[in-house]
């Protein structure tokens, strides 16, 4: 147990800013601070420095608080915290060092805030009633049995950045593009459907959206450069670059809710990609609020880096464990989010995840909220040894309704993602991987990869990481990768067949099927296996390509429809082909074999 964890008290009361009927309360947790000052601003523009300052009073258990008699909805704010210099080992570059009294003063936004202005530099007091789009109070998640679940992953920008997608120019790359219900390719009347209309026709039940909390790699004022967003700044605030006005903290909330409501109206549930394992930088808001507490340290005193991003968050520490659980419940309750995908879940402790499961279950309809993540990390971390992390070794301690991505299925079907030209079952090595693929189809029962129930296993062959499925197939099914047909314009019938079989295996396997958006129309990134900060053009969904390759989309549509009609695919019940003649038991079977022409189900 670390010194700060052993010596600092845990605070159980509300944190952040709370707008009450007759006033506003500001509360932060900063046990080592000797003074905390609240600064109030009229605007979110960091160039406008005119402010009113108020000293917070020390409360119980390491908290500081100020109660105002005014309802300060729409007011922006930040904090100035003063610490003994000895309490701050990682001094921010903008800190004020007071040599005379041996203190350091640090500015920070509120890490517990629910709204903020441009680039998250100032937090905002929010009146949630004013952020509800029309019809929000009647919004309900679609009732979808877990056995019918089919997950489609996308990015807010990728979904609508293509100028041929038919989205209004002001909605491209924004939350509001999901509210455009009748878009077509190039706005042609009766043309190929794009956006929400396309999703409804495809038949997927859940859309997993890559990070849409406030992240740091994109300038919200300009919307550039492009980034996936795996660099959190404010966990409980929507990303401003996806809104039509990043300076007004209420707009991003309203438009994010509108996106979710539109998906619900289309019969689709929403899964939020969350990144509680690290933050944008070592010098983050939580570290500024309580230096040395929220981030893990290695044995030499530096930041632990199992995430590969410079800092690992200490989920096992009580106040960050509480932060994670509170954050998940908040997004589910306030935004009607239907599920959570945990980035590098192998860096989070199983106790926190299990507690989150219990708290989400308490919400109305909460038991239907999905939880799953990546059971691995980028490198070793330095968690407290009494806690078990949710990696492949520790995942057996997870609640039976917390799942994980099955890389065993992925690599067996298409080949190891770490070896770009290594084929799998569908693209060159059917004999080598046949037994593993049989295990995949059966949900890995009887193997080390099995879960407490088959619903814990996310079956997939493509996600935002690594090569797209099409690019992997192109690289492994041609002798010269320099001439890979990424555009799918030549003689690629054998590659299309491999793509189709891969989809068939995933969509008839036990567990929950998952796909990267565009997999169903041979999405390409031209061999780029990590496009997180490449151009919007490389990453966006090419709706013209979708129209051109609609025959493959029809194959996916058929598979999805068959799976949804037959829950036996989900729970993995299998038949013996030599079953007794005349048996009355309901039976379902699929047969797959690798061929060089598009397959049919048998």
What is the predicted function of each stretch?
Residues 8-11, 511-528, 546-602:
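Glycan-recognition and catalytic regions of carbohydrate-active enzymes
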Residues 157-335, 341-364, 369-370, 381-382:
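Substrate-binding/active-site clefts of carbohydrate-active enzymes
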């Amino acid at each position: 147990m670390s010194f700060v964890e052993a010596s600092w008290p845990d605070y159980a009361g509300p944190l952040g800013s709370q707008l009450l009927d007759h006033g506003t309360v500001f509360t932060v947790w900063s046990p080592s601070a000797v003074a905390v000052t609240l600064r109030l601003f009229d605007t979110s523009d960091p160039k406008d420095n005119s402010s009113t300052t108020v000293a917070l009073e020390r409360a119980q258990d390491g908290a500081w608080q100020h109660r105002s008699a005014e309802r300060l909805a729409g007011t922006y704010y930040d904090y100035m915290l003063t610490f003994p210099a000895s309490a701050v080992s990682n001094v921010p570059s903008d800190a004020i060092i007071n040599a005379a009294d041996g203190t350091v003063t640090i500015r920070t936004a509120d890490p517990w805030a629910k709204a903020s202005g441009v680039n998250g530099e100032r937090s905002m007091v929010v009146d949630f009633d004013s952020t509800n789009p029309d019809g929000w109070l009647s919004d309900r998640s679609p009732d979808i049995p877990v056995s019918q679940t089919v997950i489609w992953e996308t990015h807010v920008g990728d979904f609508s950045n293509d100028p041929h997608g038919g989205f209004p120019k002001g909605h491209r790359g924004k939350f509001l593009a999901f509210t455009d219900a009748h878009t077509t390719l190039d706005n042609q009347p009766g043309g190929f459907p794009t956006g929400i209309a396309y999703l409804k026709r495809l038949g997927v039940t859940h859309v997993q959206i890559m990070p849409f909390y406030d992240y740091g790699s994109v300038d919200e004022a300009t919307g550039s450069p492009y980034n996936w967003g795996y660099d959190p700044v404010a966990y409980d605030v929507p990303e401003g670059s996806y809104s039509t006005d990043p300076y007004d903290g209420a707009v991003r909330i309203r438009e994010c809710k509108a996106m979710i409501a539109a998906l619900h109206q289309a019969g689709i549930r929403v899964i939020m990609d969350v990144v509680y394992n690290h933050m944008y930088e070592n010098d983050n808001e939580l570290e500024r609020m309580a230096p040395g507490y929220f981030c893990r340290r290695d044995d030499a005193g530096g930041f632990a880096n199992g995430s590969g991003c410079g800092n690992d968050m200490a989920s096992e520490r009580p106040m960050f464990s509480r932060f994670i659980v509170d954050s998940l419940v908040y997004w589910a309750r306030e935004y009607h989010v239907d599920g959570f995908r945990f980035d590098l879940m192998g860096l989070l402790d199983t106790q926190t995840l299990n507690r989150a499961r219990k708290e989400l279950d308490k919400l109305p309809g909460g038991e239907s909220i999905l939880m799953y993540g990546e059971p691995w990390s980028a490198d070793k971390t330095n968690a407290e040894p009494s806690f078990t992390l949710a990696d492949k070794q520790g995942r057996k301690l997870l609640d039976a309704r917390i799942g994980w991505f099955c890389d065993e299925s992925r690599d067996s079907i298409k080949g190891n993602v770490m070896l770009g030209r290594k084929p799998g079952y569908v693209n060159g090595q059917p004999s080598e991987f046949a037994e593993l693929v049989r295990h995949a189809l059966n949900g890995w029962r009887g193997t080390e990869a099995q879960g407490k129930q088959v619903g814990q296993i996310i079956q997939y062959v493509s996600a935002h990481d690594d090569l797209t499925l099409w690019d992997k197939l192109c690289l492994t099914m041609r002798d010269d990768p320099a001439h890979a047909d990424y555009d799918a314009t030549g003689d690629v019938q054998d590659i299309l067949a491999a793509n189709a079989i891969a989809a068939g295996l995933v969509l008839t396997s036990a567990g929950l099927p998952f796909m990267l958006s565009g997999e169903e129309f041979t999405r390409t990134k031209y061999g780029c296996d990590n496009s997180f900060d490449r151009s919007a053009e490389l990453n966006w969904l090419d709706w013209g390509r979708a129209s051109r390759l609609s025959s493959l989309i029809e194959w996916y549509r058929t598979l999805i429809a068959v799976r949804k009609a037959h829950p036996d695919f989900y729970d993995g019940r299998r038949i013996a082909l030599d079953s007794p003649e005349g048996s009355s038991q309901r039976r379902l079977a699929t047969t797959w074999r690798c061929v060089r022409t598009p397959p049919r189900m048998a």
